[in-house]
Amino acid sequence: MRNPVVWGMIYFAVGCIFTYLAASSPGSMWSFYSILLMVFAAYNISISFKMFAFSFKIKKNQK
């Protein structure tokens, strides 16, 4: 379970869930709740991209 690709998929899925929750939150899009969820989503998606890049770097160094 230490594979960076698996963790990248998990972080990306959680980021998508946070994005969905922020988009479907009651009230306006500029409420504290929706902004907080979007911050969490951006963080998770950025971590997923870092995990995918790290996996590519590991595979490149193994050759």
Swiss-Prot record:
The chain crosses the membrane at residues 34-56. It is a lipid-anchor. A lipid is attached at C16 (N-palmitoyl cysteine). Keywords: Cell membrane, Lipoprotein, Membrane, Palmitate, Signal, Transmembrane, Transmembrane helix. It holds the Pfam family DUF4305. Its main location: membrane. This is Uncharacterized lipoprotein YdiK. It comes from Bacillus subtilis (strain 168). The lineage of its organism: Bacteria, Bacillati, Bacillota, Bacilli, Bacillales.
